[in-house]
């Protein structure tokens, strides 16, 4: 099962129905993506919750003003089709208004961080 797609879909659906929290399976990848979303100001908080032997991440969503459009997440690299980019050709989402989350050899980071460190990687998703 694609945990990244599950995370993105859960957040997207929660925004559609105006839910305040989202619960997803705790994986290191989901935690790192959540950390980036928190750092960039797309979500309010993250916490870990244990239910028996299972661990979950609880994302508290951040809502903007009513008239503004909510955040959009789009999965780019999929299990059946991986999309890679080197740092000079790293895509800019909406001309720099959004972010691309990239999995590199040095961990999961934003496209800006990858360009700054001059490393490429797999483009996981776009957020704007």
From Swiss-Prot:
Q: SUPFAM superfamilies from the xrefs?
A: Ribosomal protein S8
Which Pfam families does the annotation name? Ribosomal_S8 (PF00410)
MF GO annotations: rRNA binding; structural constituent of ribosome
Gene Ontology biological process terms from the UniProt entry = translation
Disulfide pairs here are none
Quote the InterPro entries the UniProt record gives.
Ribosomal_uS8, Ribosomal_uS8_CS, Ribosomal_uS8_sf
Give a GO cellular-component term. ribosome
Keyword check for Heme:
no
Per UniProt, subcellular location reads as:
Plastid, Chloroplast
Q: Which PANTHER family match?
A: 40S RIBOSOMAL PROTEIN S15A (PTHR11758)
The text of the family note is: Belongs to the universal ribosomal protein uS8 family.
* Complexes and interactors: Part of the 30S ribosomal subunit.
What is this protein's function per UniProt? Answer: One of the primary rRNA binding proteins, it binds directly to 16S rRNA central domain where it helps coordinate assembly of the platform of the 30S subunit.
Q: What is the recorded name of this protein?
A: Small ribosomal subunit protein uS8c
Query: Which species is listed as the source?
Result: Welwitschia mirabilis
């Amino acid at each position: 099962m694609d945990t990244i797609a599950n995370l993105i879909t859960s957040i997207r659906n929660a925004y559609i129905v105006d839910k305040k929290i989202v619960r997803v399976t705790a994986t290191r990848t989901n935690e790192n993506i959540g950390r980036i979303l928190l750092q960039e100001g797309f979500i309010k908080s993250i916490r870990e919750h244990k239910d028996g032997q299972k661990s979950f991440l609880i994302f508290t969503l951040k809502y903007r003003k009513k008239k503004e459009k909510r955040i959009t997440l789009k999965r780019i690299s999929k299990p059946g089709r991986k999309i890679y980019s080197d740092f000079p050709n790293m895509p800019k989402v909406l001309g720099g208004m959004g972010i691309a989350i990239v999995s590199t050899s040095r961990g999961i980071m934003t496209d800006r961080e990858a360009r700054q460190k001059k490393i490429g990687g797999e483009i996981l998703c776009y957020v704007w």
